[in-house]
Design a protein with these regions (language model features):
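Small/polar (Gly/Ser/Thr/Ala-rich) solvent-exposed segments
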Residues: 65, 89-103, 158-168, 178-207, ...
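Amphipathic alpha-helical coiled-coil scaffold segments and their short linker/junction regions
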Residues: 54-58, 110-157, 295-357, 505-510
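Sec-dependent N-terminal signal peptides
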Residues: 4-13
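Acidic, low-complexity, intrinsically disordered peripheral segments
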Residues: 20-28, 33-42, 90, 97-127, ...
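Hydrophobic, lipid-facing positions within transmembrane beta-strands of outer-membrane proteins
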Residues: 171-177, 319, 377-383, 425
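Periplasmic alpha-helical coiled-coil/stalk elements that build and connect Gram-negative outer-membrane
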Residues: 3, 21, 29-33, 40-41, ...
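Amphipathic alpha-helical coiled-coil segments
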Residues: 66-81, 208, 214-233, 242, ...
């Protein structure tokens, strides 16, 4: 009997030692995990509101800068189109070296005829001189006849030598002007097309601006969501750790079994892992936030996931009309229709005549007969009427008309799609708002339930699993509510961007 009693006492003593040892091991492992848990710290980060962040994005986003350059480029092209009404003035210079001088050899080509004509002139003058009575032939008349004969002799010798028209070196300069008087309306059409292209560049910039705002809202409130979720999970981790410590104390005094303590430890371990993952996600969102702001310093949002639940959205018709009247993509399609019409006019101009005024002032050396023959200046008018052309003018005209119909059909379909998208986004926004409001009471209920379960557990009226379930339920509802708030904000931003009413966004979000 004594041996049996001693054996039972020894078993109880050993089991008590094992329990104490298990409690100490569990306590040490949990303490090490608690030490590894790094608390959130954004105190050193610069806080930015959404408006301030948007201002920084407008000044530093390279995508927006690229579209600004596109607008400036379109403006230059518009000015270039207007300059087509100016005349074209060119200053040209020519230097030509001829293989041989330009000359005419009368003696070689017409030598017999020239000699015969010269002889006949001499013979005629001699006959005149012989037939004149001596009393009439005065010294003056005789001297005149001799002069004429000498002149014809010189002419004969001149005709017998080559006549030089131009030397081998020819240098000519010209100041020329060409001014189109009528081009079939092509120049006016090109100016209107350039103006439409500039408007289109402005609409592309507006579209890029709206999409960048949507991206900023997504990144900004994405970081807010990740921050608040990480804070919530950190609080859950602390709550599980506190509950685990209470379970350890109650196990030591024998109020609960070790399996209850192990359950509390498992819950704490899971909460710790979830908290670490949330912090990792937060670090990634921090990088995205710094990237969109083009900042190397750590920045943090100052806003919270809070929304104006008491403020009602405008009617759906307001957003639909605003979108159809001002959305940049629809404006771009409208510009494309106008550009297609102007292209049709440009194709028609190819069938019409063209009239040009031209003129030139020539600068020359005047050291040859050929250059002396060239006039110093000239002006004129030239016309051109295309009859047959291998460029496919008719087919290009037909293609431009088809482009008009294509752009018109795309605009009609785009308006239908945009109206459907606005309806969908509007209803999604209202749905998220209702869901957010409904979760407010669920959060209050979960908080009260956790409070009651913790009090009951401390009094031995509740189990460890009930406390853990109550805390996990509260955290899941809080995270769900924050996720719904984030979805509401993103949907609201999309709705405001579609209607080009970014200014209204700030009235519904803190």
């Amino acid at each position: 009997m004594k041996k049996t009693t001693l054996f039972v006492l020894s078993l109880l003593f050993i089991s008590s030692l094992n329990a104490v040892d298990g409690v100490s091991k569990t306590d040490l492992s949990s303490l090490s995990m608690a030490e590894d848990s790094v608390p959130l710290n954004h105190s050193n980060a610069q806080k930015l509101s959404l408006k301030n962040a948007w201002t920084r994005v407008l000044s530093s986003h390279e995508g927006l800068h690229a579209q600004e350059y596109a607008i400036k480029r379109a403006s230059k092209m518009k000015l270039a189109a207007k300059l087509s009404f100016l005349p074209q003035i060119d200053l040209s210079a020519f230097y030509v070296y001829l293989s041989n001088p330009i000359k005419m050899d009368f003696a070689g080509q017409k030598q017999p005829g020239v000699q015969k004509a010269t002889n006949q002139i001499h013979q005629g003058l001699q006959n005149i001189q012989q037939n004149i009575p001596p009393q009439v032939l005065t010294p003056q008349i005789q001297a005149g006849i001799q002069g004429v004969m000498q002149g014809f002799g010189a002419l004969s010798s001149t005709l017998e030598s080559p006549l030089l028209f131009s030397k081998q070196n020819v240098v000519i300069g010209a100041l020329s002007i060409i001014y189109p008087l009528y081009m079939g309306g092509a120049r006016f059409t090109m100016v209107r097309i350039a103006d439409l292209m500039q408007k289109d560049a402005n609409e592309v910039y507006r579209l890029k601006k709206l999409s960048t705002f949507q991206e900023l809202v997504s990144v900004y409130y994405g970081m807010v969501l990740n921050t608040e979720v990480a804070e919530t999970l950190e609080e859950v981790e602390k709550g599980h750790y506190k509950h685990f410590q209470n379970a350890l104390k109650m196990q030591k005094v024998g109020q609960i079994a070790r399996v209850e303590t192990l359950g509390a430890q498992v819950a704490y371990d899971k909460a710790h892992i979830a908290s670490v993952k949330a912090k990792d996600v937060l670090e990634v969102s921090q990088l995205s936030f710094n990237s969109i702001l083009s900042s190397k310093d750590d920045l943090a949002p100052s806003s919270k996931l809070e929304i104006h639940t008491e403020k009602n959205l405008p009617d759906l018709s307001f957003f639909v009309s605003s979108t159809l009247n001002s959305y940049p993509a629809l404006k771009t399609l409208e510009n494309q229709i106008q550009i297609s019409k102007e292209n049709t006019k440009l194709q028609i101009a190819k069938f019409l005549p063209q009239v040009h005024f031209f003129g030139s002032y020539l600068m020359k050396q005047n050291n040859s007969v050929f250059e002396d023959m060239i006039p110093s200046w000239f002006v004129g008018v030239a016309g051109r009427m295309p009859i047959l052309s291998p460029t496919g003018r008719i087919q290009k005209y037909q293609a431009s008309k088809l482009a008009e119909l294509q752009a018109s059909s795309e605009q009609i379909q785009a308006k239908k799609n945009m109206e459907l998208l606005v309806n969908k986004t509007y209803k999604e926004t209202l749905s998220y708002l209702k869901e957010y409001k409904s979760l407010i009471s669920s959060v209050e209920l979960a908080k009260e339930n956790l409070k009651l379960q913790e009090q009951a557990f401390s009094q031995g009226l509740s189990t460890n699993a009930q406390v853990i379930d109550a805390r996990n339920t509260l955290s899941s509802i809080i995270v769900e509510q924050k996720s719904v708030a984030y979805k509401y904000i993103i949907s609201l931003a999309n709705l405001m961007a579609l209607s080009d009413r970014i200014d209204l966004f700030y009235e519904f979000v803190y």
